[in-house]
C-alpha cells in the first residue's frame, strides 16, 4: 500500500517540479532567482534544465524510495534490486537483447516523431554537437536511468512481490508506460513490452543491473541515431 501511494505522489511531484519555467517563476524575487532563470533559460544550451530534471527524478525515483526502504521498512536495499552480482547468462541475454533492440531503435530514428523528440539536449550557441556538452549530458542521463530502474524494477516490483507475486510486474508496467505518454507512440507502446521484460528480469534475478545497462545503451544509441538522421 505504501509503495502504491508513494508511486502516485512521487510521479505527481516529478511532473510538476521538473517544469523549469514554473520553477523560475516560483523563485523570482528570491535570493536564488538567478538559479531559476539559469535552469529555465540558459542561453548556451538546455543542459542546466536537463540537469534539474535529472535531479528531481533522482530524488523521487531513488532517494525517497531508498529512505522508505531503510527507515520505514528497515529492509536491505539489496533486496530491492541492488544485489551486486551478475545474473546467470547475463552476457548472453545482454547480447540477444541488444541484437533485437538496436535495429528497432535505428528504424524508429528514421521517423519524424523520433527526430523531433531526440536528443533531449539542445545547443543554441553554435558549439559542435558532438563534444563535451553531449558527453556531460549522456552521463547525467545515465544517472536518471539508474533512478528509474531502481524505482520501477526495484522498489515497485520487490515491494509488491510478497503480496502480488508475479502480478507485481504488471502493476509496475502501468505507471511505467504512462511516463512515456509525451513520447512518440511506437516508443510508448514498446515501453509496455520493455516494462514487462525488465520487470521479469528483476523479479527473477533480484537485480536491476541488466535493465540499467540495456536502458543506457538504448538511450545512447537513440541520441546517436537521431543525430545521424538529422545529418
Say what each PLM segment does.
Residues 100-231:
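Transmembrane helix-loop-helix hairpins at the membrane interface
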Residues 1-4, 47-50, 165:
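Membrane-interface helix-boundary signature
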Residues 55-76, 143-162:
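Transmembrane alpha-helical segments in integral membrane proteins
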Amino acid at each position: 500500500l505504501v509503495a502504491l501511494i508513494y508511486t502516485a505522489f512521487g510521479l505527481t511531484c516529478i511532473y510538476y517540479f521538473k517544469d523549469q519555467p514554473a520553477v523560475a517563476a516560483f523563485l523570482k524575487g528570491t535570493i536564488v532567482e538567478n538559479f531559476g532563470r539559469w535552469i529555465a533559460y540558459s542561453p548556451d544550451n538546455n543542459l542546466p534544465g536537463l540537469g534539474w530534471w535529472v535531479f528531481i527524478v533522482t530524488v523521487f525515483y531513488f532517494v525517497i524510495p531508498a529512505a522508505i526502504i531503510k527507515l520505514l521498512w528497515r529492509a536491505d536495499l539489496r533486496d530491492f534490486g541492488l544485489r551486486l552480482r551478475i545474473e546467470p547468462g547475463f552476457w548472453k541475454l545482454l547480447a540477444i537483447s541488444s541484437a533485437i533492440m538496436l535495429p528497432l531503435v535505428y528504424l524508429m530514428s528514421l521517423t519524424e516523431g523520433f527526430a523531433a523528440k531526440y536528443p533531449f539536449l539542445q545547443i543554441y550557441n553554435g558549439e559542435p554537437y558532438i563534444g563535451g556538452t553531449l558527453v556531460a549530458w549522456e552521463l547525467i542521463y545515465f544517472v536518471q536511468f539508474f533512478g528509474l530502474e531502481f524505482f520501477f524494477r526495484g522498489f515497485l516490483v520487490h515491494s509488491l512481490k510478497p503480496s502480488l507475486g508475479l502480478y507485481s510486474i504488471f502493476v509496475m508496467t502501468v505507471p511505467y508506460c504512462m511516463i512515456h505518454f509525451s513520447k512518440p507512440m511506437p516508443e510508448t507502446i514498446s515501453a509496455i513490452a520493455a516494462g514487462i521484460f525488465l520487470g521479469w528480469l528483476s523479479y527473477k534475478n533480484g537485480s536491476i543491473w541488466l535493465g540499467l545497462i540495456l536502458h543506457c545503451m538504448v538511450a545512447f544509441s537513440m541520441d546517436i541515431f537521431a543525430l545521424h538522421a538529422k545529418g
